[in-house]
Amino acid sequence: MNKTDELRTARIGSLITPPSLAAEHPVSPAIADNVTAARKRIACILTGEDHRLLVVIGPCSLHDPKAALEYAERLNALRRRYEDRLEIVMRAYFEKPRTVVGWKGLISDPDLDGSYDVNRGIGIARQLLIDINALGLPTATEFLDMVIGQFIADLISWGAIGARTTESQIHREMASALSCPVGFKNGTDGNVQIAVDAIRAARASHMFLSPDKLGQMTIYQTSGNPHGHVILRGGKQPNYHASDVAAAAESLSAFNLPQQLVIDFSHGNCLKQHRRQMDVAAEVAEQIKAGSQAVAGVMIESFLEEGNQKVVSGEPLVYGKSITDPCLGWQESEKVLALLAEAVSHRL
């Protein structure tokens, strides 16, 4: 009989189970407390009970644990300085959606060479999340793969569904099961309605099929996630201006949803020019100063060194510089946080 299945499978390997990974990289009670407390604070910001500003800031993607932890230590000092006005959460992205092809993140390919040592990558990612949370600094990530969350979601205080997957039914179902607040980005073309629809979908109960913590395929029934929100990330044109925020808030209001939202300073809003994140920050700071309650949070791409670099086989990488999207450097990151903290002082 002719074989009819797995005709295009090149390799199959065994993946560590979530309990085995958790046993190798356990969560302490103090870290668990840090995660749950941060989730509660973020939820209060997203419902308008807390008028501070959520700031999700960090590298486009993480590829070097040492540089990531140094960045986290610096950021944590600023978190403590501004905690009366800003809820600073470190962007810790281990999965990268690609428009066509490219490096898909530290979990998939930790050695940056196409060897796909996923078991090693997922261990590095989990330990790094533990180390960052141990500082007292909460972490945020994008949930892209439907299985990866089983390995790291217990360490995440805020999650995002990206522009390419906001309209995906399975990602909306996954968001309904996640224990943290989840932001949905508008589409790559700027369509905000798909993010509003995603929030509505994620608030509902869903049934979907997924492996459980032991790897057994399971029928999941979710209770829904009440803390979904829109992330304005730009599209064919930027959408961070006051008129854009008002239009998005009106779309949310039409369905009796909380009108608080997050503005991404990068991607379409900075026209893919990383330095323009500072211009976006200045405009959004003015909205906050003017008393806008709709701007509940912002996202910023930032690392130790400005810009980005290509991975070239046999050549060393610049320490602390992104290998995906270009980022603000540390000095500009300090400036943007000071600017936002000062703006929030006017609305508290």
Swiss-Prot record:
Keywords: Amino-acid biosynthesis, Aromatic amino acid biosynthesis, Transferase. One of its GO terms (molecular function) is 3-deoxy-7-phosphoheptulonate synthase activity. One of its GO terms (biological process) is amino acid biosynthetic process. One of its GO terms (cellular component) is cytoplasm. It catalyses: D-erythrose 4-phosphate + phosphoenolpyruvate + H2O = 7-phospho-2-dehydro-3-deoxy-D-arabino-heptonate + phosphate. Its EC number is 2.5.1.54. Pathway: Metabolic intermediate biosynthesis; chorismate biosynthesis; chorismate from D-erythrose 4-phosphate and phosphoenolpyruvate: step 1/7. InterPro entries: Aldolase_TIM, DAHP1/KDSA, DAHP_synth_1. Stereospecific condensation of phosphoenolpyruvate (PEP) and D-erythrose-4-phosphate (E4P) giving rise to 3-deoxy-D-arabino-heptulosonate-7-phosphate (DAHP). NCBIfam families: aroFGH (TIGR00034), PRK12755.1 (NF009395), PRK12756.1 (NF009396). This is Phospho-2-dehydro-3-deoxyheptonate aldolase, Trp-sensitive. It comes from Enterobacter agglomerans (Erwinia herbicola). The gene is aroH.
